[in-house]
Curated annotation (Swiss-Prot):
Residues 97-171 form the PRC barrel domain. One of its GO terms (cellular component) is cytoplasm. It holds the Pfam family PRC_RimM. It comes from Geotalea daltonii (strain DSM 22248 / JCM 15807 / FRC-32) (Geobacter daltonii). The PRC barrel domain binds ribosomal protein uS19. Keywords: Chaperone, Cytoplasm, Ribosome biogenesis, rRNA processing. Binds ribosomal protein uS19. GO terms for biological process: ribosomal small subunit biogenesis; rRNA processing. It comes from the Bacteria. It is found in: Cytoplasm. This is Ribosome maturation factor RimM. An accessory protein needed during the final step in the assembly of 30S ribosomal subunit, possibly for assembly of the head region. Essential for efficient processing of 16S rRNA. May be needed both before and after RbfA during the maturation of 16S rRNA. It has affinity for free ribosomal 30S subunits but not for 70S ribosomes. The keyword Chaperone applies. The gene is rimM. Belongs to the RimM family.
Amino acid sequence: MSSGNQTFLIGKVSATHGVRGQLRITSFSGDMDSFMALRSVMIKKPGGGMETLAVAEAKAHGKKIILSLKGYTDINDVLHLVGREIYVLRDQLPLLSDGEYYWCDLLGLQVMTEDGDILGELVDIISTGSNDVYVVHGGGDKEILIPALDDVVLDVDTVAGRMTVSLPEGLLDL
């Protein structure tokens, strides 16, 4: 997953902002700063494929990002972009410190206990503000919510495709 050509979903156009062609973006990256340095974004077209657009400016606005695109100066120019997903190339993103991961690198990992018991696949991540929560699907309809805390998540090996956890007592009984 280290290819610089890999596209990376970082957000979604949730609405327009004002009348000057700005877009309100919901960030999926958890790091607003990753938007601020972007020079271009790729927006997924309805029928598939990507459209690359140059970024004029990106700024934080509460929990959203306000994105201005070069050449788009009127609300009518950007209405068709509402609801679309925003991607960037992986090499446009900042490098992470040890122990930090992009969500796309965690999704799909096999989650197991420190004893080697397989719990299931990490299928979603919920951002709660204080810490993320990993949604793991076991067999059937079984869903396990695992707090993304240092004392719970013991090891992440993206190359091997697995995460090792030490579950808090009673978590599986819920």
